[in-house]
Amino acid sequence: MTVPAVGTQEAKRRTPFVGGALGVARAFPVTLALTTVIVIIGVLTGTVFRADHQSILDAVGFDLEALKSGRLWTVPAATLIQAQPGIKWHMVLLVLALGPLEYMAGSLWALLAFFLTDWVSSILTTLTLWALAGMGSGTAERLVHTPDMGSSAAALGALAAVATMLPGGLAAVALGGLLVFLGASFTWWELDVATAHLMAAGAGVALGWFLRWRRKAAT
């Protein structure tokens, strides 16, 4: 009887794992790439660059001054760097939202949803705060001049797109639950954060409806 070599047995045990990992990487390249980049940045800002985080926020974060001056080139970076140093909760939400969207709509649309919903949210939130500040809101006046950045709005935008693309009544239930959560979040999040999340979700719903129409038109 021939006894298989130990190395051969170990290689056979590793092969399904390696094959499975490669399969996941091929199926969800955008989700894995963005999550990896954001986590690495989070680790770096929480350790090596922790003392420089405020300077990074001032240079990259989006606020009224950035909008007025047309400093939009920093917006992509602002989507990837968090407003607080270190690892944050929405990094998990990103995987839970972006992964299903990439599966349902494809990698390109997942990438576009991630960035576009955040960019639309950044501009609309700043304009909303500016309008509220003009109406006498002291909170809005303070926040509209406070630089902000992060990927939580992008994650919620992707989640809203996924909810919109669900079949039948599931979409209505999911969107209703998301709307209740976002409305209630104004009681525990700052006005700018809650507004940004709501705006991103709105952009995600619009994108989700477009993708539903596109999918239906293709069948």
Task: Identify the function of each model-found stretch.
Residues 102-110, 161-174:
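Membrane-helix interface "capping/anchor" motifs
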Residues 141-162, 196:
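Membrane-interface micro-motifs in multi-pass membrane enzymes
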Residues 13-57:
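N-terminal signal-anchor transmembrane alpha helix
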Residues 22-37, 70-72, 148, 168-188:
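Aromatic-enriched alpha-helical transmembrane segments of multi-pass intramembrane proteins
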Residues 45-107:
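N-terminal TM1-TM2 helical hairpin plus the immediately adjacent luminal interfacial "cap"
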Residues 74, 92-99, 153-161, 176-186:
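Hydrophobic, membrane-inserted alpha-helices
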Residues 189-205:
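Loop-to-transmembrane alpha-helix initiation sites
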Residues 38-44, 118-127, 177-192:
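Aromatic-anchored segments of alpha-helical transmembrane domains
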